[in-house]
Design a protein with these regions (language model features):
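Basic, Lys/Arg-enriched alpha-helical interface segments
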Residues: 1-66, 75-80, 88-95
């Protein structure tokens, strides 16, 4: 699949890099998960991949860490990276 990166996702990644809250390893795990999704392979269950509900039901979430969540959707042939952040950051923006 081809990847589309939302402007919000780019801003979120930059914010999280600057925060110092996430390690280089965390970003490597994120990259690995994105590659796995792009290749349409199953994501390891430890990352708790699940669909969102309600008005966000077209999106899915993956927990990179317990409180660092990737929000994305698949619209073939695209994998759309929508946003990333903590629960409050992500779900506040989804409303």
């Amino acid at each position: 699949m081809k990847i589309k990166i939302a402007k919000r996702f780019k801003k979120d990644v930059e914010r999280d890099r600057r925060s110092g809250q996430y390690s280089q390893l965390d970003f490597e795990i994120l990259k690995h998960i994105i590659t796995t999704l792009q290749e349409e392979k199953p994501v390891d269950p430890i990352y708790k991949k699940h669909p969102l509900l309600g008005t966000s039901k077209r999106y899915e979430a993956i927990h990179i860490k317990s409180d660092w969540i990737l929000i994305f959707k698949v619209e073939k042939p695209f994998l759309i990276l929508a946003m990333i952040g903590s629960h409050p950051q992500v779900y506040k923006k989804m409303k």
